[in-house]
Amino acid sequence: MTKCNIFNMIFLKFSNAFIKKIKYLSIISIISVFLLNSSIVYSCSKIILIFDNNFKENNKNILNKLVLPIKNIILKGTSNLEFNDYLLKLSNFYGSPIHKCIYNFPYKKLQNNNLNNLKYIIFKSKIDNNFIKNMQYLNVSNDNIDNVVRCIKLELKIHQLKQDHKCNILIQNNSFLKHNIVQKNIILSFEIPYNTKNIYGFFTKKNKFFDVHGISSAPIFLKFPFLKKYRISSKFNPNRFNPITKKNSPHQGIDFAMPIGTPILSIGDGVILNAKFSIQAGNYITIQHNCSYITKYMHLKKILVKIGDKVKMRDKIGLSGNTGYSTGPHLHYEVWLHKKVINPKNLKTRECLIKKNLKEHINFSNIIITQFEIFK
């Protein structure tokens, strides 16, 4: 008998000669007694019986009978076993925390399945209304659902895949892990099959999804604060000659030539620090995005927000104009990091995990990817 502390499991290994001498009911009795006398919490543990391939090929009937009565047993090997209308692929099993693989049932059929005995669920589905209903039935929070749907749709768009492309969702069943305490379940990860290299997103404590390398699946910032492309009339330049003052002075942002009245968007979530008029900047807006970043938008025709307002990425905050010290209709856009101005082109639009968090994330990601591979 071997204990694996990482996954909170017990491994029992029997010789084939021993197995052949007893009936499957005897095995169930042995395991039941063992569990009752064990200090390990039943609902957070699992038993793994290890058989070699020759035994399994010759004794499929026994194994099927053994699996059905004990729902938290998974076997190691290369052949498949039918498991209560679910298909478990058992090859290369090295301690998966996943019990069953659930395919994309219609909503009504899913309601008829008892999922309370599952710790983890893999759900294969398209991202559509049926998917959202199923996630809600599985007691996943709307915020979690919205988050994963947004990330997946973005990845599909980036990789030029159809929006009805199928993906795999890994759900943690908290009602099982917490002994039926009412708590929302969590989508831990998603996998999008894509050629020879699949696309992954992994849920973190930050309530965001990150890829295998620790980079956020969804951007936290827009590249620029508008939807269409506009000509750069003046680049970021610490030593620029100022056409207004006729002196060398830093140009701390980028100027985009655009028609007056062009909608200007917040590049990310944040709070409005300033929304007023000044002689030089004209109508301008300053947004604090987090503890690190501040963005500024100048020479606006109209301001659509006020100090203290909370804004989301892509919220319309103003209209471009030609106010203040300006030689023509344009938007002056600045980005500040830790109170120092940076070139807006160098803004990292996706969040990156660092140091300890990154190491833990990569380890977690590798484990989950292995489990996705098992159920293909």
From Swiss-Prot:
Main location group: membrane
Entry's Gene Ontology cellular component terms: plasma membrane
Gene3D superfamilies attached to this UniProt entry: 3.10.450.350, Glucose Permease (Domain IIA) (2.70.70.10)
Entry keyword tRNA-binding: no
Entry binding sites for Zn(2+): 251
GO molecular function, a single term: metalloendopeptidase activity
Highest classification ranks of the organism: Bacteria, Pseudomonadati, Pseudomonadota, Gammaproteobacteria, Enterobacterales
One Pfam assignment: Csd3_N2
Transmembrane segments annotated in the record for this chain: 24-44
Entry-linked PANTHER family: MUREIN DD-ENDOPEPTIDASE MEPM, PEPTIDASE-RELATED
Name the UniProt record assigns to this protein: Uncharacterized metalloprotease bbp_296
Similarity section: Belongs to the peptidase M23B family.
GO biological process, one term: proteolysis
Organism for this UniProt entry: Buchnera aphidicola subsp. Baizongia pistaciae (strain Bp)
UniProt topology in membrane: Single-pass membrane protein
Alphabetical list of InterPro entries matching this protein: Cell_wall_metabolism_enzyme, Csd3_N2, Dup_hybrid_motif, Peptidase_M23
Subcellular location: Cell membrane
Keywords on record: Cell membrane, Hydrolase, Membrane, Metal-binding, Metalloprotease, Protease, Transmembrane, Transmembrane helix, Zinc
EC number: 3.4.24.-
Cofactor(s) this protein requires: Zn(2+)
